[in-house]
Amino acid sequence: MATQKQEKSVIWDWLTTVDHKKIAIMYLIAGTLFFVKAGVMALFMRIQLMYPEMNFLSGQTFNEFITMHGTIMLFLAATPLLFAFMNYVIPLQIGARDVAFPFVNALGFWIFFFGGLLLSLSWFFGGGPDAGWTAYVPLSSRDYGGLGIDFYVLGLQVSGIGTLISAINFLVTIVNMRAPGMTMMRLPLFVWTSFISSTLILFAFTPLAAGLALLMLDRLFEAQYFIPSMGGNVVLWQHIFWIFGHPEVYILVLPAFGIISEVIPAFSRKRLFGYTAMVFATMIIAFLGFMVWAHHMFTVGMGPVANSIFAVATMTIAVPTGIKIFNWLFTMWGGKITFNTAMLFASSFVPTFVLGGVTGVMLAMAPVDYLYHDTYFVVAHFHYIIVGGIVLSLFAGLFYWYPKMFGHMLNETLGKLFFWVFYIGFHLTFFVQHLLGLMGMPRRVYTYLGDQGLDAFNFISTIGTFFMSAGVILLVINVIYSAFKGERVTVADPWDARTLEWATPTPVPEYNFAQTPQVRSLDPLFYEKIHGDGTMKPAEPVTDIHMPNGSILPFIMSIGLFFAGFGLIMLNMDNPIINPWIVAIGGLALTFGCMFVRSIKEDHGYHIPAEQVKADLAELKKGGN
């Protein structure tokens, strides 16, 4: 028999929650903190490059910043921020009461978070990793890489476990938890792209985990996988890394495409043009994304045949991506467009991403890549993809879903000011870096001489970074201001949108839907507005709702993995104050002990009685939500 829900303090409630909505907000906060941290590093690096031969940062500090900036932005900022929206929105969009495995959802967050903390601890033990975010061997070997590389390896290994189990959870949720009538071809595009992105995580993070394990064995136990003098192969690391690294771009950009595919139809007052083509284009992009990893290695010496095959495969990705671009444009064509902040970010994404794609096709030409490789042209290209593609989409999604997540609107005036300051700053920063690359400025250098003609463009690029920073500060001000003065949202659907999450009350109750909705079409809420009375028809009567109990075990298990990783890092420390094996084995014992407790403990959750659900429904009807 299920127990009654226990009353908890606020902190205990958040530490033990398995509610997908609260976990989403924790992902949002953690991802934002890491985003700001990596952004400050970027600002410091641009200040160092503002003038020739600056001494704002030393070469060593610059190397550490450039490594941590890339690593944090991809693993600990972009990924969790997308996971925040995936966690909050997917169950609501498919008509589910939670994800398939709420306990695993909480575990995925806490493992990611403590993995990020483990990586960040490197600053207190001699400095961060300094081999670049790709950690190419031999730069990351024991001979050249300091203790920071051990934090990189173990921090990403722990964090990656959290990402992997969360992806499995999303896959099972989307396959098994859909409301009656919601076939796969009625899924919102955001759910489709998240589903395909989670599949990519499944296949991309496993080689990363294997590669990090081999590098760990090289560094901690003197294995020889990547040491040429002992029969190892440094190019092997490059292949292992990039067969993860290139799909990682699509792991991030596909859910971003999904956000754009939700925002543009909502504010164009039209259904998404070419839904079926968009679904299959997403599948093709994901498939081809695994076929092109070696285009990062054109200058390694794979030979003309391999280079040619990967060059052609890379250019082919432009075709399904082009389909998506035109479908977004056709969605806006003839629509009654509302240019609020979310729509400004979504529509500006399109030309920005196209420019990033065009430079991508240029880089795909293997002979020309010999000129571009390791120059600022490449830096400009991938920032147009990651900032112009992923970050603009995240901001669009934030302004779009913020009322549903927090119960109040963000200020539109501050929002539009944020958009223009950030967007102008972005192009100022990165457009001129194409030109710096064509002029021959190499990546990852901490200074340059005054007679090389690079002064003006570097100065402009740094000014742009100040604009971007000012934009992010405006966003923070907006969030704080709106929390106190923002317009409160009391209706379910402030945007007159099309999908199921806008059929839930605001704020969303812990059980999401009092009655599981019956889905009759793609864009189910819009269908009911046209063919019904504007409300979703229930697929079941009002009954007791079963809910999972919260648990502190995910938090404790993650602490155990944190200490296990730290204990292994201590093996490379000089004179550790405690035997590293005690820390490592103790951490693993804590994690496996929690797994054992979880296995033998009977926990059937609790029920929300039908009477309470009916009372909630009556209250909502009275309030007009």
Curated annotation (Swiss-Prot):
Induction: Elevated expression at high pH. The chain crosses the membrane at residues 23-43, 72-92, 99-119, 151-171, 195-215, 240-260, 272-292, 309-329, 343-363, 382-402, 417-437, 460-480, 551-571, 577-597. GO terms for molecular function: cytochrome-c oxidase activity; heme binding; metal ion binding. Cu cation binds at residues 246, 250, 295-296. Disulfide bonds: none annotated. It is a multi-pass membrane protein. It comes from the Bacteria. GO terms for biological process: electron transport coupled proton transport; oxidative phosphorylation; respiratory electron transport chain. Fe(II)-heme a binds at residues 69, 383. Keywords: Cell membrane, Copper, Electron transport, Heme, Iron, Membrane, Metal-binding, Respiratory chain, Translocase, Transmembrane, Transmembrane helix, Transport. There is a cross-link at residues 246-250 (1'-histidyl-3'-tyrosine (His-Tyr)). One of its GO terms (cellular component) is plasma membrane. Pathway: Energy metabolism; oxidative phosphorylation. Its EC number is 7.1.1.9. It is found in: Cell membrane. Its main location: membrane. NCBIfam families: CtaD_CoxA (TIGR02891). Belongs to the heme-copper respiratory oxidase family. This is Cytochrome c oxidase subunit 1. It comes from Alkalihalophilus pseudofirmus (strain ATCC BAA-2126 / JCM 17055 / OF4) (Bacillus pseudofirmus).
